[in-house]
Amino acid sequence: HPPGNPIFMLTARFFANFAPDAAKISVMVNAMSGLLSALTILLLFWTITHLVRRLTVKNDQKGELSLTQYLVIMGSGVVGALAYCWSDTFWFSAVEGEVYAFSSFCTALVFWLILKWENRADEPQSDRYLILIAYVIGVSIAVHLLNLLCIPAIVLVFAYRKYKDMNLKKSIYALLISFVIIALVLFGLVPGFIKMAQQFELLFVNGFGCSFNTGAVVYAFVAAAIFIWAIVALRNDSSPLLMKGTFFLAIFVSGMLFIGSSQWVGWVLLAALAGWLFYIKNNIPVRVMSVIMWSIAVIFVGYSSYALILIRSSADTPMNQNSPDNVFDLASYLNREQYGETPLLYGETLYSGVQREYVGDSQMDTGEKNDDGTPFTIPVPNYRQKMEKGNMEYAKGVAGAAPAESAGLKPSEIRNNEKLASRGGDYYVKKGRKEEPVLNPELNMFFPRIHSRMHRDAYRTWVSLDTTADNLRELHAVDVNSGKKVPEYDVYGQPTYNPMTGTVVFPQ
């Protein structure tokens, strides 16, 4: 199921090869989880002993450890590692065929690697550990995104090792930088590769008439070539202009700056990067640019395992959820769009209604008659749910079949769809823009926990939903002409006509 976890699938398939028959495949996959969990405990033991050694052994101590120091260091490692090993959370993930054992192993591995770097930070080739950490993070993205939570700890270890005057203020700065790195990886690199591949795919399939996924393959080769060019230029210490130019080109082709749904954000960030590289910062250390280039490149290598999802879906296997056999469906697959979104930091509550917009009046029969005998009707305003349109969505076209006219498409877009259909061969059609309902913001809040209107009855079994008048906030609309507050009308309720007074009353 989305998002696929291809590295987990490949590793589990490797262990399944050792099953004597099909009935034992699940046993071998569970054995994989057990083995990876055991390695996690080993890495945790090494991590604890390293940190305790730093606390108990002074830098200027010479000779071997004393017996007391040895027992403290080894005892701490054994107690800490086994306490985690036998905890319910870890133990039950270690004995099931799920991704969490693998994810724990990747997490333990990257933190142990930063400690290995910390031991050798002054050596000329210590950067290889940082690049290896980036590669493991790239691989672990194809297992579970939890591994990204190691980045703040890694940045703190790096900062305290490189800078001797660290304090609370600088530690907070380091944490903020780590959050920026997480955002660039999670919201930049991970979807950025797919966004760039989509543009290449449209160019080669719709523009040049190539077969499906040709553009994605071309993008992979182009990106690899540009990364190699940038790395070689930095390694050979070429001219500053060439090094900065290839560095900028590699950042662009990675798509990491195209954060969010708007392309303007990416172009603005690229312009800012170009200004910083070529006009503001003239003496960027080659070593820093080289580590950044290598890190992005190896993350790209690890992330390329998602090609398995495309290949597997193209084979049309019996279990083929969402059929992500092209980069457009793959993006929806990786973004977990089928699960919807949960407001974690800020968003709607159970009582946040959707906004509605006026679309015209209809006539309601009051049951009375006019003087001429015709029905006496009153106008009733009609509203529709207000929707916010997002990015254009594409779908694979059916060869030789004219695409159905999609709601929300412009006439020019419909004509372009028909033109591609008449051309024949493989092509992608525009199927409309993704729409999201616009909610009334008055009842939004920070950290909403009860937000789904579909689960109102379930919430009542868990907590008390007090809806008495004392606990409700009265809301008013503002008359745009007079500026006075007026009661809001219930656009769901039907107005009532009073024949005695001849008035129409709308429910508030």
Task: Identify the residue ranges that each predicted region occupies.
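Short hydrophobic alpha-helices at membrane interfaces in multi-pass membrane enzymes
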Residues: 71-78, 113, 120-138, 167-180, ...
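Short hydrophobic/aromatic helix or loop-helix immediately within or flanking a transmembrane segment
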Residues: 1-23, 34-35, 42
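Transmembrane-helix motifs of polytopic, lipid-linked glycan transferases
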Residues: 31-65, 109-113
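Transmembrane-embedded, aromatic-rich helix segments that form part
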Residues: 106, 146-159, 191-194, 264-271
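Membrane-interfacial entry segments at the cytosolic side of transmembrane helices
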Residues: 164-176, 208-217, 236-247, 262-266, ...
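Aromatic- and kink-enriched transmembrane "portal" helix at the membrane-lumen/periplasm boundary
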Residues: 22-30, 34, 55-70, 77-104, ...
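Membrane-interface transmembrane helices that cradle and orient dolichyl/undecaprenyl
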Residues: 52, 57, 65-71, 110-129, ...
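Specific aromatic-rich, kink-prone transmembrane helix
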Residues: 43-47, 90, 102-122, 129-137, ...
